[in-house]
């Protein structure tokens, strides 16, 4: 097992995904400084209950999902508002064995890193999902800064398409987390088909 700092967020990030974050809480500024000095990373985990920011001493840490993604900082800058901006890239999934409150109220976790999913081409019956992903990227999902940062997507691979679609679809995070925890990228595409169909029917 490994001990890593955890960053609870109301979102799901897969390995290979990139995310821009604005850092303003002291505990996370300290964490980012330490990660950059040690060339280490931290875990992003989805919030199940509770708040992301801690504004009072009495406020409890949020409860989080047991599966997350270990990330590393790939870029940073000082924003116009004076806050630190960072771009992180997901590296590998992990499962949390235990988590607790550390120094500066930073959430720490004892985690086990998981094996990477197998690569598999997109079956013909799911090929249209790659087109949908392209449409989402053009109209919604990835900022110019993230595109410029070198985010690469293989539209022929089930893993890449399923991961990026899950991150970008406008659906509840609990559904995204279920897709995230799946181990078979082709099976994930099948579940995405069902989810998209339900979303279309509910319009």
Predicted regions mapped to residue ranges:
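N-terminal low-complexity, acidic/polar interaction/targeting segments
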Residues: 1-203
